[in-house]
């Protein structure tokens, strides 16, 4: 049976209540959902009426993922977010009154003008709300995005530098790890109650199958990964003609289940290379030892026995580290020794900023 069903890819709460009922009804009718299936509906507070909420609950939704991003009024106006912090907080308190509904919010760090007290207050508000989970993500400023255009034209402050974003991430770790009501699920996900399981996000990063439905959706099956057609008109036309609306498909690499397991283990950390490799009868501990030693030296990992535990710096770099670990193992298995496991110089971020921040982390830990 299907363990997690996720409605995302944008703002599903923008749908009318009648459409929400239709799509949830179709899913429950046609998909073999587990009795305890996590059914997540993604969206935002703006326009999410009581009628839409009832449609979600009637359709079996047991988890809401709300993109709050920030509670700061100035930052929200700058990002063209319509609802006031007071309204958002009030609505989240109302949503939190539903006993069998996990309410999870996303916070972003790195917005222009968000550093210091602004981010500290965002974390404090989130920690005290009657919700079930919080995700803390770094803001990505894409080259052709409206935000980047505004920054380049001087209409708003620059986004946080990498070093500043890393410090903001570290502050979120300190806030929630020291709070008695919260416990950690992954590097970026925190739970306050047992209602928050975060199943979809954890399963999707590992070797589990993930069936994608809808324009632009991506997933994988038996190691084959693919994406649905991204242009809505073309996707709709292909569906009407009975064609599979596949935009691109990739065949599985050698040892793909091992690679997926390794990546998800590094991302969720701590991890045991001997145990991971043993589950697949492949020795990955010895070939990856130089990589791990370099990361320990860089202040990204700590080792105790067979267990590698990411430091706060390693937790911040987890996506890059997971990617580089699988790339390193792939090249080692294929006898390609050209790989250099340096998560700083090979990342998309500024090497100087990253090195400067890692030095400050090392000093703090000393």
Predicted regions and their residues:
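C-terminal scaffold of the Radical SAM
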Residues: 1-282
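Charged, E/D/K/R/S-rich low-complexity terminal regions of large eukaryotic assembly subunits
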Residues: 217-366
């Amino acid at each position: 049976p299907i363990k997690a069903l996720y409605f995302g890819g944008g703002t599903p709460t923008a749908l009318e209540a009648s459409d929400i009922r239709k799509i949830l009804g179709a899913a429950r009718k046609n998909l073999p959902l587990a009795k305890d299936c996590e059914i997540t509906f993604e969206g935002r507070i703006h326009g999410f009426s009581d009628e839409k909420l009832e449609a979600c609950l009637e359709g079996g939704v047991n988890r809401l993922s709300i993109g709050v991003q920030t509670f700061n009024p100035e930052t929200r106006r700058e990002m063209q977010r319509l609802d006031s912090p007071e309204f958002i907080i009030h609505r989240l308190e109302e949503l939190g009154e539903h006993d069998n509904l996990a309410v999870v919010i996303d916070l972003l760090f790195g917005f222009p003008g968000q550093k210091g007290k602004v981010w500290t207050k965002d974390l404090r508000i989130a920690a005290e709300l009657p919700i079930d989970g919080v995700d803390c993500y770094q803001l990505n400023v894409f080259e052709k995005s409206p935000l980047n255009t505004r920054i380049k034209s001087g209409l708003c402050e620059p986004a946080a530098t990498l070093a500043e974003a890393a410090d903001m991430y570290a502050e979120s770790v300190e806030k929630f790890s020291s709070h008695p009501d919260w416990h950690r699920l992954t590097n970026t996900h925190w739970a306050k109650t047992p209602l928050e399981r975060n199943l979809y996000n954890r399963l999707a990063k590992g070797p589990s199958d993930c069936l994608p439905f809808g324009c632009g959706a991506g997933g994988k099956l038996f190691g084959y990964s693919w994406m649905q057609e991204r242009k809505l008109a073309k996707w709709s036309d292909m569906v009407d003609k009975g064609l599979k609306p596949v935009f691109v498909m990739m065949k599985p690499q050698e040892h793909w289940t091992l690679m997926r397991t390794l990546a998800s283990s590094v991302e969720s950390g701590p991890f045991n290379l001997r145990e991971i490799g043993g589950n697949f009868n492949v020795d990955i501990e010895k070939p990856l030892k130089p990589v791990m030693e370099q990361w320990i030296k860089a202040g990204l990992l700590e080792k105790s026995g067979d267990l590698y535990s990411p430091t706060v710096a390693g937790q911040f770099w987890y996506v890059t580290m997971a990617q580089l670990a699988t790339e390193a193992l792939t090249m080692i298995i294929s006898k390609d020794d050209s790989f250099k496991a340096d998560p700083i110089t090979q990342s998309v971020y500024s090497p100087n900023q990253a090195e400067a921040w890692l030095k400050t982390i090392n000093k703090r830990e000393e």
